[in-house]
A protein has these predicted regions:
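Signature of N-terminal electron-transfer/Fe-S-associated modules in redox systems
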Residues: 1-155
Length: 155
């Protein structure tokens, strides 16, 4: 099946097998490997991308359902919120193994786009769908709060 997607600001025409999730289109067809496979059932968050600015799990999102929508992967995250999150991640040395980080960062940027001043409970609630086997949850929470501070300082 031929589908046209807009990925990281550019239009791409891809030929995908019926039932192929967006995750595999991104990784295998477009060679955008920052988006990770974790569970395949939308439970871990490693595959999070933005579709029209909304964080979605690419392992259960199908290209034919989002044709014409803007897909943003970690490679293309250039929003104000995305830059603040990446700066905070580096400042607070959040990463351990790093496998979940692209999904964590995409979710955090989505939260801050919706709510620029989240409280700790809002951060936890929004990020709870992102699993980290290294248990960096406290550092993730601190980095999201720091990114909110960066955004506030820059406004």
């Amino acid at each position: 099946m031929r589908t046209t997607l807009k990925v990281n600001g550019r239009s791409v025409d891809v030929d995908v097998a019926d039932g192929m999730p967006l995750l595999w289109v991104l990784r295998d067809e477009l060679k955008l490997t920052g988006t990770k496979y974790g569970c395949g059932v939308a439970s871990c968050g490693a595959c999070t991308v933005h579709v029209d600015g909304v964080p979605l799990r690419s392992c259960v999102t199908y290209p034919e359902d989002i044709e014409g929508a803007e897909v943003t992967t970690i490679e293309g995250l250039a929003t104000r919120e995305g830059r603040a999150v990446q700066q905070a991640w580096a400042e607070l040395d959040v990463v351990q193994c790093g496998y979940c980080q692209s999904g964590q960062i995409m979710s955090a940027a989505g939260l801050l786009a919706e709510n620029g001043r989240p409280d700790p409970d809002e951060i936890d609630g929004y990020m709870e769908g992102n699993v980290c086997r290294c248990a960096t949850y406290q550092r993730v929470r601190a980095a999201v709060a720091r990114a909110a501070e960066i955004l506030e300082d820059d406004s």
